[in-house]
Amino acid sequence: VLLSLQSICKRLAHLGLKAHYVGEITEPAITPNDLLIVGSASGESLFPVAIAKKAKALGAKVAWIGSNQESSAAGLADYIVRIPVQSKLGRPDELKSIQPMTSLFEQSLLLYGDALARVIADRKSLDLKGLWQYHANLE
């Protein structure tokens, strides 16, 4: 899940938005002007729930992406995106997968991030060719 969230963060940065992931070496302080995006299929994973609680205590908004809409993480969220696929809880309302564990959730999260980036680019009328200015150039 972390890799998918890091990829979403990268997509948002490529749109010229200030985006950081929790734990990166240059992570700034979160403020009431910020949005924390957490992902957890079950919504009960300790780290996402703990950082969501901390972000709320510091006045930030929280968006949660996951499967279990009755979870602790969902209860903390200002915004919810439900991806109703297999989680560690194995709830009957989750789409089952032949893939192990939460692979389908991680893949769906990555695709959701790509779609979100495209929607933001369209709504901001961004010139997609102009976005290369934000792409890494030490490659």
Predicted features along the sequence, with ranges:
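Glycine-rich phosphate-binding loops that contact phosphosugars or nucleotide phosphates
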Residues: 2-111, 117-118
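A short, charged, Gly/Pro-tolerant segment at domain boundaries
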Residues: 115, 121-139
